[in-house]
Amino acid sequence: MPISKGIFLSLLSTLPLALAGHRSHRCVVPSSNGTRDDSPAIAKVFAQCATDSIIVFQEGVDYNVFQPIKAENLSNVEIRMHGNLHLPQNISAVQEIVKAGNSYWFTLEGPRVDWTGSEDINHGWINSYGQAWWDANPPNGTGIENRPHLLSYTTSDATIKYMRSRKPIAHNCRLHGDDITVTHAIVDAYSTGGFPFNTDGFDVAGTNIRISDSVMYNGDDAIAVGSGSHDIVFERNTIGYQSHGMSIGSLGKDPTDFANITNLRFEDVTVIDALYAARFKSWTGGQGLVKNVTWKNIRVFNVTFPIFVTQSYWDQGANRGDVDESSSVMMEDFTWSDFTGSINTYQPGDGSCASDPCWYNAGLPNLQHTEAIILECNTATSCKNFVTENIQLYPQSMDAPHLICMNATAELNPRLGFDCRNGMYTALSERH
């Protein structure tokens, strides 16, 4: 039966979209089988197959990546990471490369850049050999100089599946862009010696980014949501070791940079042995607005600070000089609901302490480490519409849970769920 002109034109109009999604080139990355540096071969494949291609790192094959890889003009490319990558283990040589201006070992940029790792847990790993770097950190140091971050990934309309990172030296992945889905990732920065400073899992900025069904064991934020982020979801994940949790910020360090974040949801997450679980951090003197944020169904086991907000963030390595103490990044419509589990009473903190007092205890002189909730609002107007519901957290000592609360006024926070004060935590719904 002949089709109408209207239907024909409609089908014709979709042809460019169909063609845009087709990846017509399959490019297999060659390997030296461990005999030399494979970086030149990898860079050549990325250059030759930068558009409408599938780039294959073969399963069961090892690749030595001894020089940084920059692929900044990609478009509609799938990276099939079925082999295992190995970064160099010569610390001084890598430091010289970083000093020359290479902050990230891998830089991937362009629309529709997908990452597909192997479903076999033995394949698809990036091995950074961070343990030697962490062990080289001197006493009271916060990480040796010129550490490379692993991956800068800037894309849109992309899917990242089965990305696996073993012992990243510093930040694991800077993920910027729009409409990105991450599933079944593993970040393993578990240390057998020195503390793994700054081993962030995913530093995120963009719109409509979802990270789910993943595992992150590290020594900094599992996820850190930065300014300019909207519609971010972090769900069904397990995070821990000495993690700094599900974090927003830090924001407002530069008083001239207006922070803007909306619509974040952290849900159905298990947090094990971490310093923080749900965390917001902004600097005194900052400006901006963070609105509509929810942490829900969070299970914590041996966590020092399960719910933590500070608008007076402090960095043990920073000196900001004079700032406007009355200025804050504003927080509005925040909800914490259905938190269960144990507070780390007996061995609170983590291995990142390099100052006295420890950076995470600064400004909290009367800590008992039975605190279920700490809310440090900078002013009486900087926190609005805070809600807590069904907070079932208990100290390991079996003492009553406590709270520290500053400036979350009842007038601006009628559903806060407790009286904002320092002392024993009792939900208003539990009172008779």
Curated annotation (Swiss-Prot):
Primary site of residence: secreted
Active site (record annotation): D220 (proton donor), H244
Protein localization: Secreted
A Pfam entry, by short name: Glyco_hydro_28
Keywords: Cell wall biogenesis/degradation, Disulfide bond, Glycoprotein, Glycosidase, Hydrolase, Repeat, Secreted, Signal
Family per record: Belongs to the glycosyl hydrolase 28 family.
Name of the protein this chain belongs to: Probable exopolygalacturonase C
Taxonomic lineage of the native organism: Eukaryota, Fungi, Dikarya, Ascomycota, Pezizomycotina
Gene: pgxC
